[in-house]
Amino acid sequence: MTKFTTEEVRSKFITYFKANNHTHVPASSLIPHNDPSLMFVNSGMVQFKNVFTGQGKRPYNKAVTSQKSLRAGGKHNDLENVGYTARHHTFFEMLGNFSFGDYFKEQAIYYAWNLLTKEFELPKDKLYATIYHTDDEAAAYWKKIAGFGDDRIIKIKTNDNFWSMGDTGPCGPCSEIFYDHGEQIYGGLPGTKDEDGDRFIEIWNMVFMQYEQIDKDTSIELSQKSIDTGMGLERMTAVLQHVNNNYDIDLFQEIINFTENIVKVKVEGEAKFSYRVIADHLRASSFLIADGVIPSNEGRGYVLRRIMRRSMRHAHMLGSKEPLMYKLLPKLVDLMGNVYPELKRAESFISSILEQEEIRFKATLERGLKLLTEETETLTKGNELSGEVAFKLYDTYGFPLDLTEDILKNRDIAVDHKGFEEQMLMQKARARKSWLGSGESKTDQLWFDIKEQHGSTEFLGYTLNEAKCKIIALIKNNNLVNDIKEIDTQFLLISNQTPFYGESGGQIGDIGTIFAKDSEVEVIDTLKYLGSIIIHKCILKKGQINVGENANFSIDIRYRQNLRIHHSATHILHAVLHEVLGKHVTQKGSLVAPTYLRFDISHSKAVTNEEITLIEDKVNEIIRDNHEVTTTLMATEDAIKQGAMALFGEKYDSEVRVVKMGETSLELCGGTHVRRTGDIGCFKITSESAIAAGVRRIEAVCGEFVITLMREKDSLLKSIESSFKTNKNELITKVNNILERNKEVEKELEKTLLASLDLSIEQIEKQSAQITGIKLLYKKVGNIDNKILRQAAENLTKKVEDLIMVYIAEGIGKLSITVAVSKAITDKYNADIIAKKLSLFLGGSGGGGQASLAQAGGNDIGKLTNIHEKLYSLLTVS
């Protein structure tokens, strides 16, 4: 049997099916574009789901893919097993061939058998097939094509061999192909009590979609039958490389050996599992970031953070003191970047995110591990860590629950899940209590009913500013009504068509006026719901408005033009950001308002002043070039092939609107735009800031609002000149002189304050209290800077060898604690411990410092009356 590399297995699979007239379809993003039920793409069929359900069409009826997939959240959560078993992964590649109404069972079985035995040269006597127990047709084909006897065809009665998309929809029996690793490995055939062993391994699964489930008890035969198959690349490569563990294949071994050369720990014993975790999680993290996911505390971003932090903990176990994951990225790009070019394009961005996340987590990892050690040192095998401690590790130290479980697994200590969830619910309740909601109570069902009865609203606003439209629904207080009579009443209005743009794609909705026979309605906002219902938020100004009557809808043209200007500017900005900051930049959000624009991007560091200037210059150059702005309707796939930018996670129809601005920008967009880039006038960035880890926000203004901004700045400058009694040419010099003078005054004030806090040895002796052979001196002071208190306390403890000095400074609603201990007695009394305990007593959360000097905070000013007793009890216990 020939030994194949991972790359050769992937290539041969795709080449084989291409030779058999299958279209090679590139892998989709790990983020499902059209399936809100999935967090991540977890199989090859996901990108074809709408084809299988009959809701979409492709220009081909046979396809082959190598699909990047991820299972680390929801139903398919393999995270805790990854690294410890032979075949569990978070990220993996699924090879698959698909038929949409073309070939069916016989041809699918033939393709699989021919590829395995002739192309991959697997011994026929090593292969077995499973079928659904009633699928006699598949059994007959296995006998005909492979020559199998009944002993090699295993009938399975469970749903393991019957696939369905849900309670209703396409479904059908499966046939799986198993490979026998040999009797030297423990395990039994599928369906036996030993089936969970590693001897017989599933290498290919074929789903024969031949039925449609109508309801719980009824299914019918499909007129168009389809095939969905899946072969795990890593599993198949292990078979072809004669190894029984996926982590022993060439791709993983390259990453593991590269890691070993950096950390200098042998790949053996417990370390072996850590190397495997790191290799797997490096792939998952890198591909997720390349597909636009950023570490966060919710949704996909939190799954990514869990994966990253688990790998970082294993790097810590290998003794890595510095960030490690980003150093491994070049090896991964070298191994997989040619097949998945998004890795190469986003390499610098991925590297930056990996490094930053590891630096951030390392700051709390050791403290969290220390707490976990302290809390579990009395626990033995079979005991349980309290949910309260697990939640503290999560909330304070950033330990995902499964990371805590992973750490305790080897000691056979469980975690109190119920207690953890109770703590989580309490936190959410506190958050809800502090949040003032909108109070809206309308139900989704109302909008579904309207859409079902009347269909989508036709948008006329690309070409018309006003139009005659029919009013089909009026909603007041979440209820459908036939008319609106009360002047100044707020209500919602839906029409069969409208020139008003409903807020979507970042562009806010239009405003304007609706005139009926004897009525006038002010439109104060326009929304879009269920993707295609346009809702006018209205106030009745005159007369009465009725369902069924025709009215003249007229948008505010100036308002719309300013929206067009700022929306078109975001497209140009997006293109320029790619050029200036790098191809890794992806849009994470936007707001197009009539007076400004906001654009959120994936970028791991602040945009420099030089970069901002360059971005502004390039955007304004494109504006001055006055490129024509054109819009075209085309198939989504054609638009993507032409290089049109699409947003991750955005749902697109089969036909999309493509907006082109010269040769500068090409994007999928349903918004409204200027006719030529010159209509924008000019562009000016007003702010740049961080809004989350790895996400930056740029705000800017265009056109007349740039002039307004310049006038405001000019007015401000003149006011400052007047206040400083100087002109703009001398302003900087004057301000610098004042700042220098302020520094001198601050130094003088600092000296004065230090002098006022200083005490002689005699004064210390007189004012301090004697406790257990040492001197305690406590002073309550005003809102004095911590730096001064630190210096004053340190000065006093240097004068006397057995002094504990405590300052508590009272500010507005807060307390500042400073504790200093003479170095001669730090073996008995620790300033850091004293400060932390005082902080907790005074309503703080602890502080930090050294044995001789520490500072902390508090906020319970009322407890100061008992501070002497607390200090005495602390020191007598110490």
UniProtKB/Swiss-Prot annotation:
It holds the Pfam family DHHA1. Binds 1 zinc ion per subunit. It comes from the Bacteria. It catalyses: tRNA(Ala) + L-alanine + ATP = L-alanyl-tRNA(Ala) + AMP + diphosphate. It is found in: Cytoplasm. The keyword Zinc-finger does not apply. PROSITE patterns: AA_TRNA_LIGASE_II_ALA (PS50860). GO terms for cellular component: cytosol. Zn(2+) binds at residues 567, 571, 669, 673. The keyword Transcription regulation does not apply. SUPFAM superfamilies: Class II aaRS and biotin synthetases, Putative anticodon-binding domain of alanyl-tRNA synthetase (AlaRS), ThrRS/AlaRS common domain, Translation proteins. Its cofactor is Zn(2+). Keywords: Aminoacyl-tRNA synthetase, ATP-binding, Cytoplasm, Ligase, Metal-binding, Nucleotide-binding, Protein biosynthesis, RNA-binding, tRNA-binding, Zinc. One of its GO terms (molecular function) is zinc ion binding. Gene3D superfamilies: 2.40.30.130, 3.10.310.40, 3.30.54.20, Bira Bifunctional Protein, Domain 2, Threonyl-trna Synthetase, Chain A, domain 2. GO terms for biological process: alanyl-tRNA aminoacylation; negative regulation of DNA-templated transcription. Its main location: cytoplasm. Its EC number is 6.1.1.7. NCBIfam families: alaS (TIGR00344). Consists of three domains; the N-terminal catalytic domain, the editing domain and the C-terminal C-Ala domain. The editing domain removes incorrectly charged amino acids, while the C-Ala domain, along with tRNA(Ala), serves as a bridge to cooperatively bring together the editing and aminoacylation centers thus stimulating deacylation of misacylated tRNAs. Belongs to the class-II aminoacyl-tRNA synthetase family. Catalyzes the attachment of alanine to tRNA(Ala) in a two-step reaction: alanine is first activated by ATP to form Ala-AMP and then transferred to the acceptor end of tRNA(Ala). Also edits incorrectly charged Ser-tRNA(Ala) and Gly-tRNA(Ala) via its editing domain. This is Alanine--tRNA ligase. It comes from Rickettsia conorii (strain ATCC VR-613 / Malish 7).
